[in-house]
């Protein structure tokens, strides 16, 4: 099953429809690809948009499984239902299939893609657990660990966490995946090969850039930059590297020029990232505003707008939202944001801390676990230097860090602040 990318091609066409000038050419091209697979755009829920540009091909009928071979019939039925957005039916068909027909890794990849298309992102955590167990127990030391299919599965797992807005867990997933599959960095940074593209490499890299910036606390950016084993990845993500350095140097205006410039532009062009951009952008602005609220007793909205290079009205709305949402004892008089005088200093500190906790619980989790993350990465370096004969001992140490076997990873409870 290597034709799932055509499904996302339909969704990309629908997403970018208003910005497309040569609609007829693109629709005809996509219709031709689908026809070669015995599929038709007429079965898509977006057909009302495409109808004026569809050719004169015969209407497509759903394939009868009794008249076609079992392997081809299964693939056709899965694709047919997914194209029609009957994702639960497509997933059910694939789940009931014989894994041996396509191989376990490819089966996982197909399932993960269907879950992403159907926005059932949480299901991919279980698939990632099963894949990791399979690779560790059944494919240890084999060339399977180096295949692009495995790398794609690990990236699909990362994307699923990102699209759930689980940014810290997504970063954790990437760090662990790089440790388990060092070839993943090469896969991510390598140019597209033009075959079977589901999520673009540029989209993966943008997701990772955003996840790191949002999840890691301001005071820990410098530590992240100094993690030597992540240098190849950081060097391959120049936008992330530049943004981290700007934030470390508190050049917030320059950072937001990039954040609201090329990063926002790329995100809004992606059918995967655009739906979460508003939330991501709000997280990032609030994160910087909380920084100023924590260190300042009195600050003006105009100063914040000027320093962050964000429109005055946007900053005023953000500050007002913070005050209203978290019921903190801070007042606004005209342009001035200040702590109310009747608030004891101890309570003031507590209230400011509450802002940071509640704006994004994952930020707090990251603060609590930053030392564990650093220790985790240091352990990777130690494990990689141990002889292969000691690998079983290394794996035990690695799993001790995770505090569980693979089947417990789904419930790491990171959102509840438990230790890694």
From Swiss-Prot:
Identify the GO cellular component terms for this protein.
Answer: COP9 signalosome; cytoplasm
Which stretches does the entry tag as region Disordered? 386-420
Q: Does the keyword Nuclease apply?
A: no
- Cite the record's note on assembly: Component of a COP9 signalosome-like (CSN) complex.
Entry's localization field: Cytoplasm; Nucleus
What is the name of this protein? COP9 signalosome complex subunit 11
Coarse class of the protein's main subcellular location: cytoplasm
Q: Which UniProt keywords apply?
A: Cytoplasm, Nucleus, Signalosome
What is the role of this chain?
Component of the COP9 signalosome (CSN) complex that acts as an regulator of the ubiquitin (Ubl) conjugation pathway by mediating the deneddylation of the cullin subunit of SCF-type E3 ubiquitin-protein ligase complexes The CSN complex is involved in the regulation of the mating pheromone response. PCI8 may also be involved in transcriptional and translational control.
Judging by the UniProt lineage, the source's domain of life is Eukaryota
Please list the coiled coil stretches. Answer: none
Which InterPro entries does the annotation name? Answer: PCI_dom, Rpn7/CSN1
Task: Spell out the Acidic residues composition-biased ranges.
Answer: 404-420
Q: Which residues form the PCI domain?
A: 177-346
